Amino acid sequence: MASSEIDRSEAFQQLTGFPIGRWQRRLLDMLLSGEPPPGVALPTGIGKTSVMTLWLIARGFGAALPRRLVYVVDRRVVVDQASREAEALKNKLAPAVQDPLLRALRQGLGLGAEAELPVSSLRGGLADDAAWRLDPAASAIIVGTVDMIGSRLLFEGYGVSRRMRPLQAGLLGCDALVVLDEAHLVPPFAALMRSIVADASPRGSGGDGMPPGLRLMTLSATGREASDARIFRLEPEEAKEKL
């Protein structure tokens, strides 16, 4: 689906109720190129969870991005907040939506006439509603805690039967973009994720018969990785922008 900058900005406004910011526009351009940065260093309170919306728009407009976004954070309260945002995106893209741009986004995401965007939360105290694993070909958003996502990636999912563990590990480890929020609080898990991504690097893009691999994008407010030129961080003019 071809898009213009106006279309992308309008899509963001419709999905979130807010105009797109400069840094969000720049990050969206990177996602549209199919090359998300390995890390994003942004100050607290700037709206880092909007990366879910940016991924959704980029995929809807045809970007070569993983079909599953796995948003991981170690605090339940943030998991619940991110889950609410994901559910809001799901509702905005409901089958009954009439807006032409949002309908085009649905089509770009591969959602059938009656299909909803699969959104699932994986954290302690909540039952897995299974929406994310019913159709491996569907675009989906999974939000979960470090222990719930990590254990599944390592074939040891909490409360998951032995028969289902390979399926869940495969869905989270292939054709998935893991967004690790507050990565500075869980350095061992961040290191584990980088190791898993490195081990999976021989995987292809899907066109060579190999399943697309796992990709990682960390979110952090500390800027510990700022020495890495590939890390996305605010430019001076973006830092001055009113939130």
Task: Map each language-model feature to its residues.
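N-terminal helicase ATP-binding lobe
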Residues: 1-243
